[in-house]
Structures are given as structure tokens and as C-alpha cells.
Amino acid sequence: SNGYDLNDDPILNTVEPYKSYTGFLRHNFKKNKWSYFSSVRIYNENQNFTLNENSYGKNIINELGINTSINYIKNKNYKLIFENYYTNYKNDEEFRLNQNSIEESFFNQSLFKSELRSIYTINKKNTLTFGLGFYSELLKRNNFNREEVSQNSFNYFVQYEGFIFENTNYVFGARYDQYDEYESEFSPRFAIRTQINDNVSSKISIGKGFKTPDYRQLYFNFSNSISGYSVIGFNAAKEIISNLQSLGQISNLIISQDEFEGKLKPETSISFNLGFNIKTNKSTVFDINFFRNQISNLIDYKIIASKVNGQSIFSYYNLNKVYTQGIEFNSTSTVFNDIEISLGYQFLEAKDNDSKNQIKNGEVFARRTPSSPTFQIKPKDYFGLYNRSKHNFNLKISYAFKDYFDIYFKSKYRSKYGLSDSNGNNLLDDFDDFVESNLISDISISKNYKNYILTFGVENLFDYTDRENIPNYPGRIIYSKLNIKL
């Protein structure tokens, strides 16, 4: 890619030119009661970048991903599954301040997951699954207070599926996790599904969740080569921001570095869901789901600083007591056997209980402009959590015109959302700055002929851009693609 530039700076580009390649290999093998699957993916990217006439550098990314799976089916009642996953992400960067000053950095992260599952089918209506797993993560990089960090955990799980009545089945599961740096956690879950009639079914579930901070949230130092934004981990934020400030790359520090003292805590949650599946006829299906999640120490992210080139820096933090609730609606319909239409909508309310209490107690104020008088924020003025839209809508239409060509159209609408607190009261209210609602649409036409697939398409059909808040939307992209099956 030659990159692109959305600003008027003659030297600095929004995204610098880069080169990349991807390789993928997959293998399947089956013999008697045994089956084996494996896949390997590699990715490499090289990019040169320029900050000004005297400051420039290069960035190299290498990724490796390996999946393996071994299945043993003893008989119709017993199955054993052994799965492994390994990934490695490596980033090397060289930065020249001038001809005599060179800074080098590296980031090398490895992750290994292994799981053994035993599935015992007691009878047609009852199944028992149990197993254990191992998780190991290793991170090596410079400019940390520890050059190498690691985390290991073991987990044990059990799940039982059965029927209460002929039309009502249930699933009970439990999981126990052991960590080397956090307290062990027990997480139960229960779900029940009822087939009310031939066209309507319901599902209710309740469960407890637990998630520790990963090293992406703790130590990540990533800049996206396409959109240009940066994401840095909680433990690395103070050091990285200080370095960027000393290089003159920070235009606005939104969050004080004092916010990154202490540790990022694990998050826990209690979740409740009530859903219905409705079939109006053979070609139309509706799914409606009501949900409520009560979360402690939610690990979230927000903008903490802006760069001199207008790009944003994100990092992670804890929210003490949070709830999310809303409704989800999805439908799929087939028209004339050739046209498939999918609709999706979500209404989301996501708020911080501490912020709600502060507003209720009259402790939160705001200004419309820096010189205007302050006024008290009311409960109706509180918008909610950062980077959450109240309304999301998506539409997909696919049309297969006999044997001639296929047309695919998709459109996604997102209502306004806030990325940062712009009036200094430490929460997102209706008087802060927002990213305006947007509509992104794509369309493509494909023609199949023997082993060839020719595609012509347009991404971001209506040419939506927001350079300041969403730099990864460069504008309308017109493309063509030829696939050859060998």
C-alpha cells in the first residue's frame, strides 16, 4: 500500500506506505477412529515512517499462528478431543532522531493454549462433558520495568446437558480457574430452553464470569499501520506517554499519568439473558434477546492522549461497578428463493453506578463553554460509558441472479458515541464532544466461471470520513478481485 494522507502536512502522512504478505497452510487426516487437523498462518509487514525532516524509522511485524486438533471417537457414546493453539507476535522498530541517534525497540509475545475434552453421551437426552486446560503466556520486550513477563493458569470444567420435559432441556456448567498471579475463581452457569410450539422457542440463562487482564491490556504497545491509532497497556502507559512527550509527539494529554498508578484488576460479572426464537414461516426467522450484565472492575479502554498528527492513543482502566442492559433483534428472510435479507438491531444502555450516584448527589458539574458559568448535571444528562452507541443497526442483502452473477450489499449504522471527557467532569454527559452517528455501506458484484471468480466492489459507498475520530475510514474504495481455484 502507498498509504494515505488526510492532513495538510507536506511531510507527515496519516498512514505511511507499507508492504505485507500472508501465508496459510491447512492439513486434514482421518483413519479409523482417529482424525487430525492442523493449520499454520504467517504474516509479515514492513513499514518506513517519518515524523519530520530529521526523525524517521522503520517497523517490522512478524506473526505466526498454529492450530492442531486430534479427535478420537471410541463409539457412539464416547468422544475425546485434544486441541492446541500457539501464536507468536513479534514487532521490531528502529527510530532515528538524527544521523547519530538511533533507538531500537522489540516486542515478542507468545501464547499457548491446550485443552482436553471428554464427551460422554449417556443416552439420547443426556450428555456429560468434562475436561481440563492449560494456558501460558510469555512476553519479552524492552522499555518495561521487567523485560520478560509470563502468566500460567490451569482450568477444570464440567457440563451436563439434559431434559426436564420433552420440550424443555437445560445445560449446567461450572469452571474452576487457577492462576499464578490472581486468586482462583469458580464460575457456574445455567441455561434452560423451551420449545413452546413448532414456531416459538425461549431461552433463559444466568451465569458468573471472570476475566483477568491480558498482556495486551497490561503491556501492549501497538500502532495500526492502516488507520494509525495506538493502543498501549495499563502498566506501560506512564513510560510510553513520557517518552512520546519528550519526543514532542503528544499534542494533548487527556488523562493524567497518575491514573496509571497501582494495578489493573480482574473483572467479574453476573449475566442474565432472556431470548425468543420465532419462525413466522419457512423463510423468515426472528431472534429477540433481552440482557442485563452487572460487572465489577470492568476493564475498558478510552482515549488518553492525542498525537501531533491528530491520531489518538488508547489505554485500559477499571470501572468499579458497571451495568449493561438492552435488547437485541435479528431476522433473516428469503424472498423468491434468490434474495436473502438479514436485519440486526441493538439498543444498549451502559452506565457506571458510581457516576450515577455522584450525579444523584449533586456532585457533578459542567460548562457549555470554557468561559460560561457552571451548572449541575442531571441524571438525564448522563450518557454512559465511552465508545458505546445506544443504537446499532445492520442490513445485509444478497441476491443470486440464477447462474449469471451474485450481488451482495451490507450497511451498518452506529449512533453517536463519546471517546473522551471534553468538559473535565470525569464522565460522559450530553455536553461533551461526540463522534456523530455514521452509516457505512459496501456493495459487490461477483461472477463465477468455472474455476474463476471475478469481483467488482465499492467499500464505504457514500464516502464517509472522520479523520479526527475514525482515521481507519480513508473514504470510498473501488476495487476488483480475481480468485482462481487450482
What are the roles of these predicted feature ranges?
Residues 123-125, 142, 146-285, 289-294, ...:
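Structural signature of Gram-negative outer-membrane beta-barrels, strongest in the C-terminal barrel
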Residues 23-29, 66-72, 114-120, 158-162, ...:
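Residues on the lipid-exposed face of transmembrane beta-strands in outer-membrane beta-barrel proteins
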Residues 163, 167, 287-295, 311-422, ...:
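Gram-negative outer-membrane beta-barrel transporters
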Residues 1-61:
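Periplasmic-side early beta-strands and strand-to-turn transitions of outer-membrane beta-barrels
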Residues 33-38, 76-80, 125-128, 166-172, ...:
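Repeated loop/turn-to-beta-strand initiation elements of outer-membrane beta-barrel proteins
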Residues 210-211, 223, 412-428, 432-486:
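C-terminal beta-signal and adjacent terminal beta-strands/loops
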Residues 24, 107-108, 113-117, 149, ...:
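Outer membrane beta-barrel strand-and-loop segments of large Gram-negative receptors
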Residues 2, 31-33, 42-46, 86-90, ...:
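Transmembrane beta-strands of outer-membrane beta-barrel pores
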